Amino acid sequence: MQVLVRDNNVDQALKALKKKLQREGVFREMKLRRHYEKPSERRAREAAEAVRRARKMERKRIEREGF
């Protein structure tokens, strides 16, 4: 991954790099890989995340349609 540093503004370049890493999901991946996760735990976590996403989408749909 590459970030341009303009006018020796390192703080702005670091901010841009952090935003790119966040968008790519690198921090989340690092957090998940910090410890071994059993396959059964992984399936349970992914199922719970799917349920959470479905509920969130349903809430947004209801809010948008006004039901």
Swiss-Prot record:
One GO BP: translation
Keywords associated with the record: Ribonucleoprotein, Ribosomal protein
Q: Return the InterPro entries for the record.
A: Ribosomal_bS21, Ribosomal_bS21_CS, Ribosomal_bS21_sf
List the record's Gene Ontology CC terms alphabetically.
Answer: ribonucleoprotein complex; ribosome
Q: Would you say which domain of life the source belongs to?
A: Bacteria
- Has the keyword Ribosomal protein been applied to this entry? yes
**GO molecular function: any one?**
structural constituent of ribosome
A Pfam match is Ribosomal_S21
What the entry lists under HAMAP family is as follows: Ribosomal_bS21
Q: Which family does it belong to?
A: Belongs to the bacterial ribosomal protein bS21 family.
Alphabetized NCBIfam families for the sequence: S21p
Official protein name in the record: Small ribosomal subunit protein bS21
- Please give the organism: Acidiphilium cryptum (strain JF-5)
Gene from which this protein is expressed: rpsU
